[in-house]
Amino acid sequence: MNPIVVREYEKIGIKGASKTDIDKNKFNKLKEFIKTNKLDEDPKFFEVYKDYIIPQNFIGSINIDNISIEIFPKIPLVKDNENHKKERFLEILEYVETFNENIYENLEIGNENMPILEFFISNFIEEVEKIVKKGLVYSYINKSENILYFKGKLDLPNHIKYNIIENRFFMNFDEFSINSMENCLLKLALEKIKNISSNIENTDKIHKLLIQFEDIETSGLNPVHLFKKILYNKKNEFYKKSLNLAKFFLLDESPYSIFFNDKREVTGVFFPMETIYESYIANKLKQLINKQISIKIQDDS
């Protein structure tokens, strides 16, 4: 089904209340989603009325059951050319840190009507497939275990605590493992989008990829902490684009996007317009003026 496309400040409502109509059941789910996530508060992304809502201050996509509502800027991205508005929208996003690639060039013929959220999921899947084809990176993981043999360094305090009678050794050692931070983050992202995507092709690919990550342990891991520890080098540089996209899905609130999931019935991806245009204009200025001049985007203070 083709997405429903509206611009900022255009009404979305039940039949007869707006130019863009959805059925009453989906409209009520959307209102509940907005209220639950406080999207009608600060920052105010919606004005909510009895029979219609008005999206504002953001661009993005909302999926309700089997339909997708896409919100584009109030100002036209391409003059008198509706067919290329998504392409221009994605071109703007490439100037945002998370999407600092030519993502709009990946908008293949036949995918023009793919919802934005599914498009990002598809891009992430494609990057992970490249990594699997090249080979998952291994790294040394520090472990502390109570084992039957000497390996590494004896952890004497824990050895005394746990092994007064048992014929074991509490050892601290490094193990060359597939449970690298990079692989753990990719698996966490795959597990999350598995519960979000409604595109049959995407979900099929996700399940196939998760088989490749079956031996990777992610229980109890905090993606926020893992991302802070990631350092790129020649060994893992090819993970960078996929991890940027994984961050978009896993951290829910990055500086440039807000992502919500409500029991899979309603999902939304939102890009605050103020932040998007600040980043876009700053990067355009860098291209136009002397590269020796430093340009910084203002912070929230």
Enumerate the predicted regions with their spans.
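Terminal, charged accessory segments of proteins
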Residues: 1-228, 238-259
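Acidic-basic catalytic patches of nuclease active cores, encompassing PD-(D/E)XK
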Residues: 16-41, 268-300
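Solvent-exposed, charged helical/coil patches
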Residues: 227-284, 289
